Amino acid sequence: CKDQYGCRFLQKKLDEDKTSTTCDLIFVEILSEIVELMSDPFGNYLCQKLIEKCSPVQRLAIVRGVSGSLVQISKNMHGTRAVQKTIEQLGSPEEIRLIRDALKGSVVALIQDLNGNHVIQKCIHRLEPNDNQFIYDAVAHHCVQVVTHRHGCCVMQRCIDHSSNQQKMQLVEEIKNNALSLVQDQFGNYVVQYVLDLGMESVCEALATNLLGHLYFLSTQKFSSNVVEKCLK
């Protein structure tokens, strides 16, 4: 599995497998090594192919097997791909619960990680808004920390895009409350502009009110001047 050619050979066998015999054999052989293989430069591709081809029962066993190491795997440059593929293939409430519980305490750390942020974004894109509440709670609670980060500002925008109305207001409220510091940040100012572009009149008015007393100062600053200009349009 860790050999480039061996890995390709096994992937080809999985593609050719019409009766699930090969899939069953590979599953039994690698399940106990799945954590290590997911982070391997070649093994991760076999894991991805297996997750695509295996049965729901086998997939649940894989999710159970990696759940304790999911954060560690997600931060790995190879492992992140295998975790994203796993999230794409999730089918049962139990699988979703296991993934959610595994990631719950590390949302902000993953968002700020070069590889881990893609796992959080995959959850946002793939899972239902109510299944992603743990992400919305984390980014709302750590709003400034998330929004002023290179990866975090992008994740916050995706959260807003895929949230329910209630979740959207939860996030927008935190952005509004922290607007004065966010508009002065190289990344945070883009998120405030993004919220303004949503065209929610009451939110735009509240944001403008929060910034009004600091208008001259903000107009002279590199990042916040962009937000002031948008407010005036």
Where are these regions (language model features)?
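Eukaryotic gene-expression regulator signature that favors modular helical reader/repeat domains
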Residues: C1-K233
